[in-house]
Amino acid sequence: ERNLELSDFHTMCERVRTMNKVTIAQIEGRVGGGGSEFAASMDMRFGVIGKTIVNQMEVPLGILPGGSGTQRLPRLVGRGRAMEIVLGADDLDAETAERWGYLNRIYGAEQIDAKVAALAERISRFPVAAVRLAKASVNASDLPIQQGLQEEAYLFARLLRTEAAQHNMSQFLQNGGQTREGELRVGELSAQLGKAD
């Protein structure tokens, strides 16, 4: 009999995926089964070269990934690769997981802490409302394209009127963001903008 309620694990993963905070998984070893499904619910995943291994081992046990793996993996890596991960139940090394899109990036063991912390710190300096609504807009990509575009336009218009947006856009222009030289270092200029909300 089909249960229309989400399981507790599904509910937890959806709360992580849709919460208004940024979630980052730093995977420094093996992640499989429910752990892989939980990590796939995060906004970003980072691994260690030669150490991170991803696996969905359920099918050989006579079951299937029941914690959101059959739904999240195709969205991350595509249908064919998701089939290979789920049906093949073989270890996916860090390099392949990055190339396929399960991991955002991979780093050496001596680099990962600093790299992930730097990204988290960078994001934490940006206006909170912009981070939250940008995440909500990306999550709206699960909607049909017309609805997703409408949601993006609505959220963009909401943010455009905020004090933080007005302040940071003005600061960006004052720092030369509209110049040819500024365009060549837009990442650096963006990092100089702080919270105004």
List each language-model region with its residue ranges.
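Hydrophobic alpha-helical membrane-association signature
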Residues: 5-8, 38, 112, 152
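Hydrophobic alpha-helical segments typical of transmembrane helices
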Residues: 8, 12, 69-72, 81, ...
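An acidic, glycine-rich surface segment that forms the CoA-thioester-binding/catalytic face
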Residues: 1-28, 188-197
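Crotonase-fold acyl-CoA enzyme core
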Residues: 14-129
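Residues at secondary-structure transition points
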Residues: 3-7, 49, 64, 147
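C-terminal alpha-helix plus adjacent terminal tail
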Residues: 89-94, 114, 121, 125-197
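Short C-terminal domain-edge/linker segments immediately following a structured domain
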Residues: 2-6, 56-58, 76-79, 138, ...
